[in-house]
Amino acid sequence: MEKILALESTVIAHGLPFPINIDTAVELEELAAETGCSAKTIGIIAGQIKVGLSREEIVQIASRKDVLKIGTAEIPFALAKKMWAATTVSATMRIAHLNNIKVFATGGIGGVHKIDQWDVSQDLAELSRTRMIVVSAGPKSILDLRSTVEMLETFQITVVGYKTDELPAFYCKSTSIHINRVDSFEEIASIFLFKEKFNLPGAVLVFNPIPDEHAIEVEQFEEWYRLSEHDLDASSVKGKGVTPFLLSRLAHYSKGKTVRSNVELLKNNVKVACEILNQLSKMQ
């Protein structure tokens, strides 16, 4: 089994500010290489799907103003229009699956929005049908966490917490929402192999909490979020623009703390994902 780890490109184009986005993208690939894995950042370059962006393509995705944020549904649109596009969790999973990649590391998954509960991320639909190990620091903190967890259960997505039985929420380490716990990479690989054996659809979604030293207290986050939400209400931003807008305002109010935490949880997720990938390769 070739040890390839999928990485998304939306965090480069819309999740982190320039030039931190470029530095982080490069560092994540280097971290994977140190473990014997090959990280492939996925994106669409001028209408062509790329599994493994070059350094120059990463710089372009990070700095261009015309990079579309796409889920699975928009992949054919971006290809037909020959666009530059950054792939979210859903689009990255779909492309990775088509290329026989079985492990994917990301920051936070999308879910049910607090502001508009009809605004539900395509990530949940893709997680429900694509068999892959996805390592994440939890649903993004800006989401309705309980509704998101209910949707994960309804869609029969296998959710486990790595060394935790409490749902992490991206910047925040704990939420008092119970999830099933695993304590080893072998357990995670075994769960995935049973899904393969019995042809069960959907992801093994591994929630890996942000390290203690980089976590943000829930009360502090909620204060920054209220200010950011007020800015959103005063703006005309809708749909796919909501999350990048809120992340930008959170970075402003936290004086960059949320950006630093985002980078650290990404690095932590890549390390854990590579350990899982190495274990999976031994067991197949």
Curated annotation (Swiss-Prot):
The species this protein was found in: Pseudothermotoga lettingae (strain ATCC BAA-301 / DSM 14385 / NBRC 107922 / TMO) (Thermotoga lettingae)
PANTHER family per UniProt: CARBOHYDRATE KINASE PFKB DOMAIN-CONTAINING PROTEIN, ZGC:136858
Enzyme class: lyase
EC nos: 4.2.1.70
Subunit field text: Homotrimer.
Annotated keywords: Glycosidase, Hydrolase, Lyase, Manganese, Metal-binding
GO biological processes: nucleobase catabolic process
Record flagged with keyword Hydrolase: yes
Cofactor(s) the protein requires to work: Mn(2+)
Protein name per its UniProtKB record: Pseudouridine-5'-phosphate glycosidase
Keyword check for Acetylation: no
GO cellular component: cytoplasm
Gene3D superfamilies, alphabetized: Indigoidine synthase domain
Catalytic activity: D-ribose 5-phosphate + uracil = psi-UMP + H2O
Active site: E8, K140
Pfam families per record: Indigoidine_A (PF04227)
InterPro entries on file: Indigdn_synthA-like, PsuG
Residues that coordinate or bind substrate: K69, V89, S121, Q122, D123
Molecular function per GO: hydrolase activity, acting on glycosyl bonds; metal ion binding; pseudouridylate synthase activity
Task performed by this protein: Catalyzes the reversible cleavage of pseudouridine 5'-phosphate (PsiMP) to ribose 5-phosphate and uracil. Functions biologically in the cleavage direction, as part of a pseudouridine degradation pathway.
Cofactor binding annotation: Binds 1 Mn(2+) ion per subunit.
Record family assignment: Belongs to the pseudouridine-5'-phosphate glycosidase family.
Residues given in the record as Mn(2+) binding sites: D119
